[in-house]
């Protein structure tokens, strides 16, 4: 299997058999790792597997690591790297933010695959306990075995913390691959401008021995990786067009979920590909008198060979602005269809930025919005849109609390035999990860439909009226 990102082959018989099962069982449905790019989670998983092998090869020369970690535990890390995304499905993170009833998080879905249909392959080809793989992926302590002494179980707890830090942490195998891969696939240079080989070559154990650190050799490479992640967030992941598409898609699914049983919606999302989901959602939003409309668990289709052309773009004429919806359900379908056609239709029509601000620009309003769950932002959006006379045509996007440019890793100075936090020895990292990221990348944005955006931008007291909508929401929430 040739990997275009690293320009080399990834070959191993156990890896090959496991990935065949993995790809056939789950990841064939999840095409895009980043929605605007053209690559798959399957490719990404092979890349993470490759980086994990490189780090293990490096750490094999570390005396403390060699004395601590057993061969089967190293195999557990390799398998966890290969299967770390097995629970994902198309648009997974966007849907999880909606908190739909019955939707289990991708971590739980991964455990069901690992302990279910993948378990025989894992045991036969890897001689690894699937529960240990789940523990590493979930950053949990391993299950205590009947033969474990107190000392042995204590050692295993340390090992599993170490393995989890290699897979998911400030500098880990997942980020190392997705920054490069997303950058290549999206056609931008930002995620490629750091020295992966030098960074991997500097990896060592931290002072406690339960996580990774880097030596001074990798300090500059680590700084450049932090910078790469900062710029990728600024110019790709949280670019205003990306965020507009995100909130439009979430709102469309939210509207549909009010009329379609969520258990069927979730089941169909798990088995459909990206393109099939687009066609499926468009069919769900056809007018009520359309014979292909499906609004119940019994007639919700599995569109194995669906195309966007099958979804009836011409039916949008039934939802023109002059036609009053016959029911609240009609209105929801109309609004959802507008959003979906803006995303997946013949001509892209994303909602436009009307306002955006950081915590520096709006120190009072910003913290009242940042970190709010989706359903609260939806309620605020609806109130604000109604107050401006544009119901259904305004969406609020605010940064979540769990996204940061992580940098909490130590740098080892062998000449002095001391460890120092990267943020302490690198003002560049501190400025990027705290000041620049928090102050400039993490912005609150208000998007509006293209036909009303220009008018809304001219409202002189826009932010004050926005604040009043938040006031009203908070007052009602306290009642």
Please name every model-derived segment.
Residues 1-78, 86-479:
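Histidine-centered, transition-metal-coordinating active-site segments
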Residues 83:
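Aromatic-lined, polymer-binding surfaces characteristic
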